[in-house]
């Protein structure tokens, strides 16, 4: 038995001429091949799944590696029209008897980003992730603190606005402030987060309606936050999504949610 997470990159892709023969659709065969090659190069994916044989420090033994997953599907929209598209998505199945405080979001996002950058110029605008929070156990504080220290090494004058949304069930109704406070605590003094007072700039998210977990038009049960982070990058978006997921857990959320982080206009 497995539980599943999913990550999707949103943005604009300008294909290189020499990669024009590659295609990608809902089944995503080309993207899957690119992503799997990259994952294998990093040592992050194995057809053997979540465990691998460790040879060091004495006799060989089977150990768990939270950077691996058991199986995956992938696809994307490479339409060449200059519009924001869901460029790449990948699902990852994880055995139910293996639970960690974090999901392999950074691993999956990195290989997706590398894959699409291999075939063209990419303007990355947003990220969404399906987070099965009910499956996570343990404390991610140390990891999130280390990520915060990494992003602290940036020019504070170049901070950027980011829109964050959470699609959750009735249990999170009215908990905007509690979640906001938990997000701010985890971001520290290098980033900002506030409950959105009005309409949120979601121009960095593709116009999809439920595909791969995200529905841009969904209104009911959506928490909205206006954030500022030290930089805009794939890694920074993953950090925001992970921080938000951990804040939701702290606020009592124990269900599957969809979290987005997307670049907002400076004037919004």
Could you tell me what each predicted segment is?
Residues 59-60, 67-79, 141-153, 197-216, ...:
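Short amphipathic beta-strand and strand-loop transition segments with alternating hydrophobic
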Residues 1-42, 135-176, 264-267:
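Short, extreme N-terminal segment that most often corresponds to the first beta-strand
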Residues 110-150, 224-226, 232-268:
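Acidic, proline/glycine-rich low-complexity IDRs
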Residues 82-94, 157-171, 213-231:
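Short glycine-rich, basic-tinged beta-strand/loop micro-motifs
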Residues 45-57, 117-133, 192-220, 250-268:
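Short glycine-rich, low-complexity/disordered patches
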Residues 1-111:
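N-terminal leader/presequence regions that precede the main folded/catalytic core
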Residues 104-202:
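Surface-exposed beta-loop interaction hotspot
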Residues 170-246:
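Intrinsically disordered, low-complexity segments enriched in Gly and acidic/Ser/Thr residues
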């Amino acid at each position: 038995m497995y539980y599943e997470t999913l990550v999707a990159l949103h943005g604009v892709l300008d294909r290189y001429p020499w990669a024009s023969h590659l295609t990608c659709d809902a089944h995503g065969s080309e993207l899957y091949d690119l992503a799997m090659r990259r994952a294998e190069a990093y040592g992050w994916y194995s057809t053997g799944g979540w465990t691998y044989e460790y040879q060091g420090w004495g006799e060989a033994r089977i150990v768990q590696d939270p950077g691996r997953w058991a199986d995956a599907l992938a696809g994307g929209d490479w339409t060449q029209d200059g519009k924001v598209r869901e460029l790449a998505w990948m699902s990852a199945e994880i055995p139910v008897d293996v639970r960690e405080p974090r999901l392999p979001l950074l691993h999956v996002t990195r290989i997706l980003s590398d894959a699409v950058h291999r075939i063209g110029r990419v303007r990355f605008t947003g990220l969404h992730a399906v987070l099965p929070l009910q499956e996570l156990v343990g404390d991610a504080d140390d990891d999130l603190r280390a990520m915060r220290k990494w992003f602290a090494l940036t020019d504070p004058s170049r901070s950027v606005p980011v829109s964050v949304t959470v699609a959750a069930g009735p249990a999170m109704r009215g908990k905007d402030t509690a979640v906001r406070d938990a997000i701010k605590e985890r971001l520290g003094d290098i980033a900002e987060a506030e409950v959105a007072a009005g309409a949120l700039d979601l121009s960095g998210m593709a116009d999809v309606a439920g595909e791969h977990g995200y529905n841009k038009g969904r209104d009911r049960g959506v928490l909205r936050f206006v954030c500022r982070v030290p930089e805009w990058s794939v890694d920074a978006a993953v950090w925001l999504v992970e921080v938000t997921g951990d804040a939701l857990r702290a606020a009592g959320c124990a269900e599957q949610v969809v979290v987005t982080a997307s670049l907002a206009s400076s004037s919004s």
